[in-house]
Amino acid sequence: MDAFKLLTRSTKLKSATTQSSTLPSTGKAANPQLFRGAAAEKLEKGSGKKRKRAHAADDEAVVNEDALNLDFFSQGRSSIPKSSDAATTKGSGAPAGQEGASESDSDADDEPMDEVQRRTILNAHKIKVTDMRDLEELAPAQVQSEEPKKKKKRKQQEEAEKQQPQTLSKKEQKKARRLFPQPLVSFKELRSKYKISRRLAENIAEQGFTVPTEVQLGSLPLLLGNSAVPGGSSDSTSATEPDLLVVAPTGSGKTLSFMIPVINKIVRHHHTHPEERGIFAVVVAPTKELASQIVNEGRKLALGTGVKVTLMKKGMRVVERENEDEDVLDESNSESSESESDERTPNNKNKGPVPITKSDILVSTPLQLVNALSDNKTKPLATLPLVRNLVLDEADVLLDPLFRDQTLDIWRSCTHPELRASLWSATMGSSIEDMAKTTIKERKLSLPQTKSYPLLRLVVGLKDSAIPNIKHKLVYAATEQGKLLGLRQLIHPTAATTSDVRLRPPFLIFTQTIPRAIALHSELLYDIPPEAGGSARIAVLHSDLSDTQRSDIMKGFRKGEIWILVTTDLLARGVDFRGINGVVNYDIPNSPAVYVHRVGRTGRAGREGGVAVTYYTKEDIPYVKSIANIIDVSEKLRGENGERSVQKWLLDALPDLSKKNKKELKKHGVKARQTGLKGATDEKEQRRTRISTKSGFDRRKEYNKKMMIAASQKKTQARKNGADSDSAGDDDDEDGWNGLDD
């Protein structure tokens, strides 16, 4: 019985358990866009008035129509016009005649936006497109067009002309690099304006995609090749697909953004070159779970288009080598024993008779693809001459020291002169951007026939920041036991105050290491009552498990059979669980970027109500400030004036972390929780950070029992060894030297 309810039954206080029904698990968000508000409507009205003054009354109808299209993005407009909504949601269910009529109407209505409209939409959705090429490569006319048009005296104009060839200021450089390409207003434009495959457009509609997210709004027109990208001259209107760096929030639809252009490009290539078959696109992801997810999403989009999407697996052949069949025959002839031939039978099937993988899009992790190209590093790296698109998902991890060499080897193996590279992530530092520019330049020098394309960067929102549609909580727990009690309080909430954090399953729990994940799983194994499913509702996932076990756990979590999943940073990136209500950082992340990706597992596609809880102890205090800063920026971006989870006094009190300690934290995590520590003080730290609620007395009893069993086994083994040595000694005495014979 709740005493608070009993004592307040005659009052009109609101129940503390009443929560808004908006949770990520309740369903799809009405609008998946993260950045939308009243500011967009004001800018759109201003642009409409500008067009009215510029044009005569005959353009008034066009202005009103454009205003309606722009109002499509505003928050005040709760719904899309019924005609467009019906056409979008029905998708392929509409008859062919009606679809063709709607397409012809949309062709007639599609008109290119002027720069004011493009700027309005892109700024309202916090989309920034920048040309990353050197200033020497940019058109001088572009620089001049960005200068403010003001009346100047002749002397000032002459001075400005003299200073023009010299180095520009930072502000002028930013203006020269800034671009405002045509945005994607709705997914219907993919078919009407950008002429994508009819079947691909139907598949997109069947998936229920109606409103493009910010990253789709900005990147799809660029990658589909129908948006004019500045080239070498100001009058160049030839549309070209650029190399692209994309920094967009987690759960914003980056997979769809790079899969649609790749599939459409391959469909066109199949029509123009039906005899040419092979791997035309390579998608690289850091984990098997993310690679498998990309394959599933790609197959949904490519259904019925003739494009095959394949997941790279061990033993697959992706290239054909010279004299490969002869090598296999020599190996088979050199073995003669029956047992060895029986063991070699599956290997022969994989090496000799197995044909080259017939796929258009290959999705792989870096190591598997490098091993396939180099025959497990026994031969020189083979080339992929037909690959025209290279996609690096979670590019900041792929170009980190852990995967950097393998990723660059894959990049160099793609030798097609028209190769386009696109890098995607929610966090991307300047070092990653510089590495991408350097790699593109080196590839151009090593392959003279390589064509040069613009290198653009698209940033959505604030760079390297957490999504604003989730609630962040930073909780001080003092000790490991305090964190465990706080976690159990989340699973079994009993408090009646409205300020308490409430988290409904399903949710993820992140730990620093695999042993800690296993220990936490065993500690929470029986916290869920049998009536609710018991221990089957909680699972642990880490890289030490087999591929089959990992796949089964992922399926169970997606189906809703598993409610709580304890894991490491294996699931921190890219994996899309759309119904997760929250994330618990049981151990603080190793870097701010890891925090952004961890909490991004909830609040996918604009879903509201997600919660991110981070526990920290006394040992974590030196490392918490960077996380607190991210939470503070995210809450400011959200724009609410309520109580903040990170107060100003806390930000001022937390210590700053040096660069050396940041690198150490990123590599090894918090020292107190590292595995394999040696020394008396380190052992003491490990005992302090142990995940357990057992008392020291119980642990000592268990330890003594284990030692007694080990000592007994040792004695038994010693007795056996002694008996064997005695019998061996007797035999030696019988066979030994018995003296000289008489």
Curated annotation (Swiss-Prot):
Residues 486-654 form the Helicase C-terminal domain. Its EC number is 3.6.4.13. It is found in: Nucleus, Nucleolus. Residues 662-671 have a biased composition (Basic residues). Residues 8-25, 75-91 have a biased composition (Polar residues). SUPFAM superfamilies: P-loop containing nucleoside triphosphate hydrolases. Residues 102-113, 322-341, 727-742 have a biased composition (Acidic residues). A motif (Q motif) lies at residues 189-217. GO terms for molecular function: ATP binding; ATP hydrolysis activity; RNA binding; RNA helicase activity. It catalyses: ATP + H2O = ADP + phosphate + H(+). Residues 235-446 form the Helicase ATP-binding domain. GO terms for cellular component: nucleolus. Interacts with the U3 snoRNA and is associated with the 90S and 40S pre-ribosomes. The Q motif is unique to and characteristic of the DEAD box family of RNA helicases and controls ATP binding and hydrolysis. Belongs to the DEAD box helicase family. DDX52/ROK1 subfamily. This is ATP-dependent RNA helicase rok1. It comes from Emericella nidulans (strain FGSC A4 / ATCC 38163 / CBS 112.46 / NRRL 194 / M139) (Aspergillus nidulans).
